[in-house]
């Protein structure tokens, strides 16, 4: 019998193997990573943390725990950018973990200051 193969699909999400093989990350956090990855590539939409919380059936505590885990293990960065006297928040989902600080503040030129 010939080796089997998967039929190709349209509209699918590709996830880096790094997080799927990371034994330190819970299945809950991996699931949240997958959900975020599936949506952030959609054109003409800016996604917020609250949007993703509303897409899941987990309660606030479970969602926040998975969110924190992604930050703590370097898969999610939070950038604070100055915007007319306030801070604008931008999230960055990483393909590979970066164990440096997960929260970064930028000056008006976009340079990291903290």
Residue ranges of model-derived segments:
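N-terminal leader segment of winged-helix/HTH proteins
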Residues: 1-9, 77
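N-terminal amphipathic alpha-helix
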Residues: 8-16
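Extended aliphatic helical segments
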Residues: 14-15, 35, 78, 112
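Winged helix-turn-helix DNA-binding recognition segment
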Residues: 19-29, 36-91
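Charged low-complexity intrinsically disordered patches
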Residues: 93-114
């Amino acid at each position: 019998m010939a080796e089997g193969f998967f039929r190709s699909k349209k509209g699918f999400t590709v996830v880096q193997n790094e997080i799927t093989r990371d034994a330190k990350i819970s299945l809950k956090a991996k699931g949240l990573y997958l959900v975020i990855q599936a949506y952030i590539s959609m054109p003409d939409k800016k996604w917020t943390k609250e949007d993703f919380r509303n897409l899941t059936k987990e309660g606030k505590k479970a969602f926040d725990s998975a969110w924190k885990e992604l930050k703590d293990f370097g898969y999610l960065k939070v950038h604070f950018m100055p915007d007319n006297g306030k801070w604008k928040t931008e999230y960055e989902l990483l393909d590979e973990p970066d164990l440096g600080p997960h929260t970064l503040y930028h000056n008006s030129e976009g340079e990291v200051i903290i």
